[in-house]
Amino acid sequence: ALGRDIMRTVGFDMARGRLDVSLHPFCGGAEDDVRITTRYEKGDFLNALMGVVHESGHALYEQGLPRAWHSQPVGAARGMSLHESQSLLMEMQVCRSAEFMAWAAPVIAAALGGDAQAPEWSADTLHRQVTRVRPGFIRVDADEITYPAHILVRYEMETALINGRMALRDLPGAFNDRIHDLLGLRVAEDRLGCLQDIHWPSGSWGYFPTYTLGAMIAAQLREAAQKACPTLMEDIARGDFSTLLTWLRAHVHHRASSASMRDIVRDATGAPPGPDAYLRHLRHRYCGE
């Protein structure tokens, strides 16, 4: 119930989609039947909730594509970097913010039978939990600071394999060495290392960089939306996502594939995709700058 309530709040049309459970969160389906999933872990409800808002970002993009173009190539989403920007904007930029947690904390406490006045259910506690930085083995569970290291390792590994610089049999050792170099962790078994993702066995080679590109674009879009709509985060703090969704519909979703990703981002933000807004976001959230 909590996940579906949050989906409705961010703008998901429940008449055109649904939420289910899977081992790995994903978004799929068709234009008027957009289905998302999340996974549940005992002792960590926030992980499941962040999975819901992440996949809801993907789903909102799909539900926002122009109906008149549904049967045409121009009506498709404009590539996975932009798609990941929509999920990461919703999850990282918005739903891990202090403003969102100010609204969500009492909603979460009520849904899970907690005392909204108790410190463990406070907005500050929940915000600290979802922005905690701690290196770990699993990419999908990584925090916002260490996540790019997981992507860098995978990018280095797949380019070395494709270019013939590394044999497949050497992948586990090379993968583990780079995880230790970047995160200081010793991988004990391959299921925590090079075998944890579905991308390579499913043929999605070269996909991993779209997550970092998406994170950069998400920060750039959120910054532009904030500039255009100064009350944006105040609205979020009241549980009102209409300002954000209206802006995204006009500047991203309704564009579909009518222009390149680069042009869509430039038109929406005034600049081509770049790292500046992303770095400002990280410094502000984690360094207080």
What are these regions (language model features)?
Residues 1, 6-20, 114-153, 185:
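All-alpha helical catalytic cores of prenyl diphosphate-utilizing isoprenoid enzymes
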Residues 1-45, 279, 286:
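Contiguous, non-catalytic segments that form substrate-binding/exosite surfaces or channel walls
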Residues 15-16, 68-70, 96-106, 168-169:
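Acidic/polar loop patches that form or flank catalytic/metal-binding clefts of enzymes
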Residues 37-42, 68-79:
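Short helix/strand-bridging catalytic loops that position acidic/His residues to coordinate divalent metals
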Residues 47-67, 84-88:
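Active-site recognition of the HExxH zinc-binding catalytic motif
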Residues 73-84, 146, 205-211:
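Active-site metal-coordination segments of metallo-dependent hydrolases
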Residues 76-118:
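Post-HExxH zinc-binding segment in Zn-dependent metallohydrolases
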Residues 151, 155-289:
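C-terminal, non-catalytic "cap/extension" segments appended to globular domains
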